[in-house]
């Protein structure tokens, strides 16, 4: 009986060491650029999956994190420039792939530039219906 208990304990220890720790979606790097009334946000994101099978769902989740400003390691400052008028994202499945420069996919979350009144531009929070995801 004691031998069975030890075998079960050893098995549990080995199995717990073999399971992958879940990866939480997070920003690996970010860069913002402003010019007049235009604010662009460029981010590199690690997805919370080994592979990204549904780009649309993953992209929408990333944009929602940007809107909610709730990435684990990064907080964006929307108090000075407001919400972005454009977001460019490179998605990676792991930090290892990020270091290698191996993207899973990339996309832009864009709107048309308002040429009639350049002082009033769409942003991702106030005018989400004016934006679309464009895959590169």
PLM regions: where:
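Extracytoplasmic/periplasm-facing segments of secreted or lipoprotein envelope proteins
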Residues: 23-50
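Bacterial signal peptide processing site
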Residues: 19-21
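Sec-dependent signal peptide recognition
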Residues: 2-9
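Mature extracytoplasmic domains of secretory-pathway proteins
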Residues: 42-106
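C-terminal partner/receptor-binding element of secreted or periplasmic proteins
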Residues: 108-136
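C-terminal motif of bacterial Sec signal peptides marking the signal peptidase cleavage site
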Residues: 14-17
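Exposed acidic/polar residues on beta-strands and adjacent loops within beta-sheet cores, strongest
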Residues: 32-40, 79, 127-136
